[in-house]
């Protein structure tokens, strides 16, 4: 999405990067507030006091989000022999408070956790249309990442390295995970 189309003070749709206009009764955005209010919306949508407030807004915490296509369900060692029904909720990779604390400390030093806190959902266990027969999709919500990396690199430069590290982290708990990943975004 390149821009949110507004009319009469209301969102009416979006303009995509390839120039298509898509109209909608409702537009939802899952982006940083500054991206939404300073880049996607027309600047005239905010009064000057609100513009100043959003310009002064600072956040440092971020998350790393990715989706993976899987050839099979992860086989977590802690859930050996468990069926698909055990994947219908969230699976958390955060085995202890110390693990979570270490993830936070890593982030303060290098910009991301060496062993991140990961929340995994496998929606294909409930909606079979999301993946081919026998396959699955998983959504990974990973915590303890800085928005701006302390060494000056951009997230575009390190995103593949970090995605590999996230997959390796899950593989420590579900040894078939890495080999089952057939696609990722």
Predicted regions and their residues:
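Mid-domain catalytic core of redox enzymes
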Residues: 2-131
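FAD-dependent oxidoreductase catalytic-site/capping-region signature
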Residues: 116-185
